[in-house]
Amino acid sequence: DSVYFTQWSDPDLGTYTDDYVGSDVDLSFGYVYNGNRLDGVFNGIFNLPVPAGGYDFLQGPADNMDLDGDGDSTEFLGMTSFAYFGAGSAIDDPDLSSYEGTLQWFNLMEGFLPRPAYPTQIPFSDPSTGLETKYALSGDPTSGAGWIDGVQLPPGDRRMVMNTGPFKLKVGE
């Protein structure tokens, strides 16, 4: 009941210094898109339109719990939280060379800011609503509605963390 799966990515899309990331909660999907209409790599070198990329939990782990009370304990978890960090920002990479960094990663897996480290947990706050959320950047970048990347930070080098859990991992699974 305390296992998490995490998909971490440093999704350098073309020129790494002009990226945005986001999450689609309903699709359990994390994505990267360009912060500028043109990109030095795709437009300048290949003469191509700027692409986007995505990460999906095609099928999350069996939760081995009956969360909705229907008697079925083999339901599957989707993305249960999404976090991000921007290089050089206040929300940046956890410390990779210390135990403190492990506690920071645990916070990210549970959908909280990495610092201060666990057991202290500070939630992400959606600037468009003022509400706490476990899904950072879950707005719609096409319409500009909700919390989208670019509101708090300019385009830049991003990392994203998609999580699913907690769930029970049975022996032999």
Where are the language model's segments positioned?
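Extracellular/surface-associated beta-sandwich interaction domains
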Residues: D1-E173
